[in-house]
Amino acid sequence: MKASILEKLEHLAERFTEVGALMGDPDVISNQDKFRDLGREYAELEPVIKCYNEYNTVLGNIAEAKVLISDSDPDMRAMGQDELKENEAALEPLELELQKLLLPKDPNDGKNVFLEIRAGTGGDEAAIFSGDLFRMYSRYAESKGWKVEIISENQGEHGGYKEIITRVVGQGVYSELKFESGAHRVQRVPETESQGRIHTSACTVAVMPEADEMAEVNINKADLRIDTFRASGAGGQHVNKTDSAIRLTHIPTGVVVECQDERSQHKNRAKAMSLLASRLSMAQEEKAAAEQASARKSLVGSGDRSERIRTYNFPQGRVTDHRINLTLYKLDEVMQGALGDVIQPLVNEYQADQLAALSE
């Protein structure tokens, strides 16, 4: 491993020890903000240092094995050869894991997200599939201990949603769901199809990290038009008799957001402002990324909503992610929320791209 990487790891190990000691300091414990920040740093460093300690242990074992190999006793030499082979085999995966752990972190990875699903081509069938995708993401979120809040919804005439916007809250939400932005295509026989013909429909998914503060995108209140209207209902549970729903229009960009989930106009306005800030922030990031884009396009997560990223073929029970040529014949499990088998290969490919870029 490169000397510069080992030097960085040694520095991180010293910092890990320092943070652990600080968290036991009564003055730090009494300062909730400081204690929380240190706790977050400790949690981020812990997997790196654990892997680094394992790496050092294996290096020590290799050194001991080499001593045994030079022993005059044949049995000791044979034992040394076995230990050397075993530990050298363990060293390479640990080096790779350490390099992955040291990759630059996406500053948005720890953020909550706004997840938007919209029916595209396919009419009623596309709206029904939007509902299927919403349930798939909701079940995956539940398995991860995340919370899903509906911000606004426009239900389809025969089920599902023409559009549904949700907020997903939890640890590391964006780090996993950021790969879901794009066009999702479904191939199946609709219930209303008497000839048994397969229809193709599509939905678009957009995943945006929640903006920390409105200041991030400098929203000027003079640039906002605020309209109130009567909510059609929150999650289908009640009909609001007051004009508590909020529609915000950002005049310079034309971006419009709505929130009608809460009974309180104040709460709806706060959620709508958060969604607006996130959309504007994402637009700024996409513009900057486009300006700085390299000639080599990343295989994973361009985030273009028109880019077809995945196909769900029901007759074949198949899910195909077109970005990495991944095909799984476990459609039922995926639609029930077992998204990990799709997301993890995308994460692996993304990290491989980062490692390749570092070595260039």
UniProtKB/Swiss-Prot annotation:
One of its GO terms (cellular component) is cytoplasm. The keyword Heme does not apply. The keyword Protein biosynthesis applies. SUPFAM superfamilies: Release factor (SSF75620). Its main location: cytoplasm. It comes from the Bacteria. Signal peptide: none annotated. Keywords: Cytoplasm, Methylation, Protein biosynthesis. It is found in: Cytoplasm. GO terms for molecular function: translation release factor activity, codon specific. The modification N5-methylglutamine is found at residue 237. Methylated by PrmC. Methylation increases the termination efficiency of RF1. NCBIfam families: prfA, PRK00591.1. Belongs to the prokaryotic/mitochondrial release factor family. Peptide chain release factor 1 directs the termination of translation in response to the peptide chain termination codons UAG and UAA. This is Peptide chain release factor 1. It comes from Saccharophagus degradans (strain 2-40 / ATCC 43961 / DSM 17024). The gene is prfA.
